[in-house]
A protein has these predicted regions:
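Hydrophobic, small-residue-rich alpha-helical packing segments that form membrane-like cores
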Residues: 2-6
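Exposed, low-structure sequence patches enriched in small/polar residues
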Residues: 7-232
């Protein structure tokens, strides 16, 4: 079901899906709700979903089953009388994920606060604070190095900070730079992400992403320096 008000301030999408398999006869539905309200200064979203343990999507990929998830969002936009900044905004997004089959145990929580600005030359910049809680349901090595994994059943609460700047996208050459640092499970992380784009209209368009992560975990867990180069 799709919702749209006449003034376009309210819109939303709602669904209920059921999968039919011979093997499973229950816990095979998925339900999703998404309601949005938008004005010049204020926007908010109320959204969530339920995916049963036995739900099988034949039409697409489902990241996780057996969860209840809510992820509302609130954003307030400012319109300053400024020659450089067109708009800037404050945004808050909490995310909660529960496991119904485990007495609705909280498995993950994200709290995200963001400030962002759009400049008159089409460049953007901002800062983000992220806090995450997670419960591990299996042994997990966050460095992906096959080192000593964090043990199943352990819980972690960690916070990191991020800033970003994107140059004007209207230019032939543009870039986005995103440094970040903070806690990472039971250790620390420093990261930098650089995306470069170049185009010759209308014949050529290319980009490359370069990411570097420096992960430090306490003994006996592994450290890692991870470099990713991904041309597109």
């Amino acid at each position: 079901y799709n919702l749209a008000s006449k003034d376009n301030k309210w819109n939303g999408k709602y669904y209920i899906h059921k999968s039919f398999t011979e093997e499973y006869k229950d816990k095979d539905i998925s339900v999703g709700v998404n309601t949005n309200y938008n004005t010049k200064n204020i926007s908010f979203r109320m959204s969530g979903l339920y995916v049963g343990d036995n739900f099988n999507s034949e039409l697409g990929y489902i990241k996780r089953t057996g969860i209840i998830k809510i992820n509302p969002n609130f954003k307030y936009k400012f319109w300053p009388e400024n020659k450089k900044i067109q708009t800037h905004s404050l945004e808050v997004t909490p995310v909660f994920i529960w496991r119904p089959e485990l007495n609705n145990e909280l498995s993950d929580r994200f709290l995200i606060a963001r400030w962002g600005a759009n400049q008159n030359n089409s460049s953007t910049m901002g800062a983000v604070v992220k806090n995450r809680f997670t419960h591990l349901y299996r042994d997990f090595d966050p460095t992906r190095t096959n080192g000593v994994p964090l043990p199943v059943g352990s819980e972690y609460n960690f916070t990191n900070f991020e800033a970003y700047y994107s140059s004007p996208y209207s230019e032939d050459f543009s870039y986005t730079l995103t440094p970040s640092f903070g806690e990472f499970f039971n250790g620390k992380i420093k990261s930098i992400d650089l995306r470069l784009s170049y185009r010759i209209q209308p014949r050529f368009n290319s980009s490359i992403q370069i990411s570097y992560d420096k992960i430090n975990l306490p003994n006996p867990y592994p450290n890692a320096n991870i470099l990713l180069i991904a041309p597109r």
